Protein backbone atom coordinates (compact mmCIF):
# COMPACT_ATOMS: atom_id res chain seq x y z
CA UNK A 1 0.00 0.00 0.00
CA UNK A 2 3.05 2.28 0.26
CA UNK A 3 1.57 3.61 3.52
CA UNK A 4 -1.59 4.93 1.80
CA UNK A 5 -3.86 2.52 3.66
CA UNK A 6 -5.42 1.22 0.44
CA UNK A 7 -4.81 -1.83 -1.71
CA UNK A 8 -5.79 -0.90 -5.22
CA UNK A 9 -6.86 2.36 -6.77
CA UNK A 10 -10.46 2.63 -5.53
CA UNK A 11 -10.77 5.04 -2.61
CA UNK A 12 -13.64 6.87 -0.90
CA UNK A 13 -11.88 10.13 -1.87
CA UNK A 14 -12.56 9.23 -5.50
CA UNK A 15 -16.25 8.62 -4.78
CA UNK A 16 -16.22 4.84 -4.38
CA UNK A 17 -18.29 3.26 -1.62
CA UNK A 18 -16.46 1.64 1.28
CA UNK A 19 -17.64 -1.76 0.04
CA UNK A 20 -15.78 -1.19 -3.24
CA UNK A 21 -12.52 -0.15 -1.56
CA UNK A 22 -9.90 -2.53 -0.23
CA UNK A 23 -8.20 -1.29 2.92
CA UNK A 24 -4.76 -2.57 3.83
CA UNK A 25 -4.31 -4.70 6.95
CA UNK A 26 -1.42 -2.50 8.10
CA UNK A 27 -1.79 0.09 10.90
CA UNK A 28 -2.28 2.90 8.39
CA UNK A 29 -4.93 0.92 6.55
CA UNK A 30 -6.83 0.28 9.77
CA UNK A 31 -6.67 3.97 10.74
CA UNK A 32 -7.92 4.95 7.29
CA UNK A 33 -10.72 2.37 7.52
CA UNK A 34 -11.81 3.66 10.95
CA UNK A 35 -11.77 7.24 9.65
CA UNK A 36 -14.08 6.36 6.75
CA UNK A 37 -16.38 4.33 9.02
CA UNK A 38 -16.78 7.35 11.35
CA UNK A 39 -17.33 9.64 8.38
CA UNK A 40 -19.93 7.26 6.93
CA UNK A 41 -21.86 7.06 10.21
CA UNK A 42 -21.71 10.85 10.64
CA UNK A 43 -23.14 11.31 7.14
CA UNK A 44 -25.87 8.75 7.76
CA UNK A 45 -26.75 10.50 11.03
CA UNK A 46 -26.78 13.94 9.38
CA UNK A 47 -28.99 12.63 6.57
CA UNK A 48 -31.33 11.11 9.17
CA UNK A 49 -31.60 14.41 11.02
CA UNK A 50 -32.46 16.23 7.78
CA UNK A 51 -35.18 13.73 6.92
CA UNK A 52 -36.67 13.62 10.42
CA UNK A 53 -36.35 17.13 11.81
CA UNK A 54 -36.43 17.15 15.60
CA UNK A 55 -35.95 13.39 15.89
CA UNK A 56 -33.38 12.94 18.63
CA UNK A 57 -33.15 11.95 22.26
CA UNK A 58 -35.26 14.50 24.16
CA UNK A 59 -33.23 16.68 26.53
CA UNK A 60 -34.86 15.29 29.67
CA UNK A 61 -33.76 11.73 28.73
CA UNK A 62 -30.18 12.45 27.60
CA UNK A 63 -28.57 11.82 30.98
CA UNK A 64 -30.25 8.44 31.52
CA UNK A 65 -27.85 5.53 32.03
CA UNK A 66 -28.38 1.96 33.20
CA UNK A 67 -27.18 3.01 36.65
CA UNK A 68 -29.57 5.96 36.85
CA UNK A 69 -32.46 3.79 35.63
CA UNK A 70 -31.68 1.13 38.25
CA UNK A 71 -31.54 3.85 40.91
CA UNK A 72 -34.91 5.28 39.83
CA UNK A 73 -36.46 1.81 39.90
CA UNK A 74 -34.92 0.70 43.19
CA UNK A 75 -38.37 0.29 44.80
CA UNK A 76 -40.00 -1.16 41.68
CA UNK A 77 -38.84 -4.79 41.32
CA UNK A 78 -41.26 -5.34 38.43
CA UNK A 79 -38.96 -3.23 36.23
CA UNK A 80 -35.89 -5.41 36.84
CA UNK A 81 -36.53 -7.76 33.90
CA UNK A 82 -36.86 -4.86 31.45
CA UNK A 83 -33.70 -3.18 32.76
CA UNK A 84 -31.82 -6.50 32.61
CA UNK A 85 -32.98 -7.00 29.00
CA UNK A 86 -31.69 -3.56 28.01
CA UNK A 87 -28.38 -4.29 29.75
CA UNK A 88 -28.07 -7.62 27.92
CA UNK A 89 -28.82 -5.92 24.60
CA UNK A 90 -26.15 -3.28 25.30
CA UNK A 91 -23.60 -5.85 26.44
CA UNK A 92 -23.97 -8.56 23.79
CA UNK A 93 -26.18 -7.02 21.09
CA UNK A 94 -29.15 -9.34 21.50
CA UNK A 95 -31.72 -10.47 24.05
CA UNK A 96 -32.72 -14.01 24.86
CA UNK A 97 -36.49 -14.47 24.60
CA UNK A 98 -37.55 -15.87 27.99
CA UNK A 99 -40.27 -18.03 26.42
CA UNK A 100 -38.67 -19.42 23.25
CA UNK A 101 -35.04 -19.16 24.43
CA UNK A 102 -34.21 -17.74 20.98
CA UNK A 103 -31.96 -14.75 20.54
CA UNK A 104 -33.52 -11.50 19.31
CA UNK A 105 -31.60 -8.50 17.98
CA UNK A 106 -34.56 -6.18 18.57
CA UNK A 107 -36.04 -5.15 21.88
CA UNK A 108 -39.64 -4.15 22.61
CA UNK A 109 -40.86 -2.93 25.98
CA UNK A 110 -44.63 -2.97 26.43
CA UNK A 111 -46.80 -1.78 29.28
CA UNK A 112 -49.10 0.90 30.55
CA UNK A 113 -48.51 4.59 29.92
CA UNK A 114 -46.07 6.29 32.30
CA UNK A 115 -44.32 3.13 33.51
CA UNK A 116 -40.83 4.17 32.36
CA UNK A 117 -40.43 2.20 29.13
CA UNK A 118 -38.94 5.12 27.21
CA UNK A 119 -36.47 5.99 29.95
CA UNK A 120 -35.48 2.34 30.29
CA UNK A 121 -34.72 2.12 26.56
CA UNK A 122 -32.71 5.35 26.50
CA UNK A 123 -29.39 3.80 27.62
CA UNK A 124 -29.58 1.37 24.70
CA UNK A 125 -29.75 4.04 22.02
CA UNK A 126 -27.26 6.27 23.89
CA UNK A 127 -24.79 3.38 24.00
CA UNK A 128 -25.21 2.72 20.28
CA UNK A 129 -24.63 6.38 19.40
CA UNK A 130 -21.56 6.48 21.67
CA UNK A 131 -20.24 3.40 19.84
CA UNK A 132 -20.39 5.27 16.53
CA UNK A 133 -23.64 3.83 15.21
CA UNK A 134 -26.35 5.87 13.57
CA UNK A 135 -29.61 6.16 15.43
CA UNK A 136 -33.12 7.52 15.22
CA UNK A 137 -35.27 8.33 18.25
CA UNK A 138 -38.76 9.33 17.19
CA UNK A 139 -42.34 9.07 18.36
CA UNK A 140 -44.47 6.90 16.10
CA UNK A 141 -46.89 9.75 15.40
CA UNK A 142 -44.01 11.98 14.26
CA UNK A 143 -42.48 9.15 12.22
CA UNK A 144 -45.71 8.39 10.37
CA UNK A 145 -46.34 12.12 9.92
CA UNK A 146 -42.88 12.56 8.38
CA UNK A 147 -43.49 9.71 5.94
CA UNK A 148 -46.93 11.03 5.03
CA UNK A 149 -45.65 14.59 4.55
CA UNK A 150 -43.17 13.11 2.10
CA UNK A 151 -46.06 12.19 -0.20
CA UNK A 152 -46.21 15.86 -1.23
CA UNK A 153 -42.53 16.36 -2.02
CA UNK A 154 -41.61 12.82 -3.07
CA UNK A 155 -39.40 12.02 -0.05
CA UNK A 156 -41.61 9.42 1.65
CA UNK A 157 -39.68 6.42 0.27
CA UNK A 158 -36.33 8.04 1.07
CA UNK A 159 -37.47 8.64 4.66
CA UNK A 160 -38.84 5.13 5.08
CA UNK A 161 -35.66 3.56 3.69
CA UNK A 162 -33.50 5.71 5.99
CA UNK A 163 -35.48 4.51 9.01
CA UNK A 164 -35.28 0.92 7.79
CA UNK A 165 -31.50 1.08 7.41
CA UNK A 166 -30.45 3.19 10.41
CA UNK A 167 -28.33 1.13 12.81
CA UNK A 168 -30.63 1.62 15.82
CA UNK A 169 -34.15 3.02 16.05
CA UNK A 170 -36.25 3.81 19.09
CA UNK A 171 -39.94 4.14 18.23
CA UNK A 172 -41.71 5.76 21.15
CA UNK A 173 -45.43 5.38 21.85
CA UNK A 174 -46.04 2.52 19.44
CA UNK A 175 -49.64 1.49 20.07
CA UNK A 176 -50.42 4.63 22.08
CA UNK A 177 -53.82 4.03 23.71
CA UNK A 178 -54.38 7.73 24.36
CA UNK A 179 -54.33 8.63 20.65
CA UNK A 180 -57.74 9.66 19.32
CA UNK A 181 -59.25 7.93 16.33
CA UNK A 182 -58.82 4.56 14.72
CA UNK A 183 -55.61 3.42 13.08
CA UNK A 184 -55.71 4.06 9.34
CA UNK A 185 -54.60 1.55 6.74
CA UNK A 186 -51.85 3.93 5.66
CA UNK A 187 -50.46 4.26 9.20
CA UNK A 188 -50.56 0.48 9.66
CA UNK A 189 -48.80 -0.04 6.31
CA UNK A 190 -46.02 2.44 7.18
CA UNK A 191 -45.39 0.87 10.59
CA UNK A 192 -45.56 -2.64 9.12
CA UNK A 193 -43.03 -1.78 6.39
CA UNK A 194 -40.60 -0.45 8.98
CA UNK A 195 -40.96 -3.25 11.53
CA UNK A 196 -41.08 -6.04 8.94
CA UNK A 197 -37.91 -4.78 7.23
CA UNK A 198 -36.00 -4.56 10.50
CA UNK A 199 -37.30 -7.89 11.82
What is each PLM-predicted segment?
Residues 99-121:
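Walker A/P-loop nucleotide-binding motif
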Residues 1, 69, 121, 139, ...:
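Conserved RecA-like P-loop NTPase ATPase core
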Residues 137-147:
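A short hydrophobic beta-strand->loop->alpha-helix junction that borders the nucleotide-binding pocket
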Residues 126-136:
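Post-Walker A helix-loop "phosphate-sensing" segment adjacent to the P-loop in P-loop NTPases
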Residues 148-199:
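Conserved nucleotide-sensing/catalytic segment adjacent to the nucleotide-binding pocket
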Residues 55-60, 67-107:
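Pre-Walker A (pre-P-loop) alpha-helix and adjacent loop at the N terminus of AAA/AAA+ ATPase modules
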Residues 104-108, 134-135, 168:
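Residue-level preference for the first positions of well-ordered beta-strands
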